[in-house]
Amino acid sequence: MLFDAFDVFLFDLDGVIYVGPEALPGAVEALERLRSGGKTIRFLTNNPCMTREQTAARLNRLGIEAAKDEVISSGWATACCLRERRAGSVYVLGDEHLERECRDAGLDIVDVNAAEAVVVGWSDDLTLRDIQSAVTRIANGAQFIATNADWSFPGPDGPMMAVGTAVEAIKMASGKTPYIVGKPYPYMFRQALQHVEDWSRAVMFGDTPDADIAGAHRIGISAVLISSGPYTGYSSARDYRKPDAIIPDLRSLWDEELRIERWIPPAFPWPDDIKPGVAGIVMDERGRVLLMKRADNGCWGLPSGHVERGESVEEAIVREIREETGLQVEVMRLVGLYSDPESQVFTYPDGAATQFVTACFRCETVGGALVRTGAETLDVNYFEAERLPDPILAMHPRWIADALAEESLCIFR
């Protein structure tokens, strides 16, 4: 049973421990039994509008023993993160509770124009002027830190806006990527497990696959979904949102028949998004392959890139090769369609990860002149397929081999 399988129990709050003003069935008794059994308990919440003391007090009013230090809130975790990043002065785009967590962490709350970091939380009094001030300061070099990226939460009359709406507005206007602290991002979970030696004995309980389950899996711990309704599931066993077990409520921790599948992290990071991509294989008259050394990561690789709006994949690869090498090409055939996340998830220097579904084409040169350097390229040259340069993007030698195999059918990998 789950009680015996783990020593450290992490819990989301809303939808797992309580809903509104009421504790969920079995929650009070389950947490009491966990404590009497010597288990470590942590409560995780993305809500930045309550201090840890307030959250612990709310749990105690429901009959659930909880200490401040057992609460890991996105507001408190953000304050810890700012202290680690040595951002002494911060502008808080949030309410007085987030400001208090920052002050308690030794941070100075300052006017936006003097801030080393801008912290995005939430306040019902937030204005467009506040958001514009944050945009300007971040665009001018201040750190961009977000308590979480939740878009909305359920309200009495429908969805209510949450932190993620402000974060996205600032991101789009400033052109800067935020560091996000709360679930499903790793920092908050690491804070919860800060003094835990064996993470394999830790488990997360949540009701949201995208935040609770995926977040736990991103740091390599098991995750259990609380759900009493129909579950449609996820088709891939490697989907980070797929729970290791599903239970209706916390009384199931002592179910003798329940077994949990231990989470084995896949060989790729969980992507933030998925995009269509293209790659092109161009050869010279000696059968050598055209490669470019990318400016963004210093690796050699095939000419490649994104599909723009309004483009076909054929148009996209012709454009990419022209922009990156100066050559004009025509598409000869489709070599393969590549989507396996183990080779197709690419992590950028800012930490963002994208999964590409890449159409790889065999192309021939019909014009243009080779340009060896540019905004995206450090060098461009032809290489024998048996003597590819190093370092080279991991998946590209496989694509080259597929093209040289002269298969008449498109390859799917």
Swiss-Prot record:
It comes from the Bacteria. One of its GO terms (cellular component) is cytoplasm. Signal peptide: none annotated. Residues 273-406 form the Nudix hydrolase domain. SUPFAM superfamilies: HAD-like, Nudix. One of its GO terms (molecular function) is phosphatase activity. Keywords: Hydrolase. Disulfide bonds: none annotated. InterPro entries: HAD-like_sf, HAD-SF_hydro_IIA, HAD_sf, Nudix_hydrolase, NUDIX_hydrolase-like_dom_sf, NUDIX_hydrolase_CS, NUDIX_hydrolase_dom. A motif (Nudix box) lies at residues 305-326. PROSITE patterns: NUDIX, NUDIX_BOX. Transmembrane segments: none annotated. NCBIfam families: HAD-SF-IIA (TIGR01460). This is Uncharacterized 45.4 kDa protein in thiaminase I 5'region.
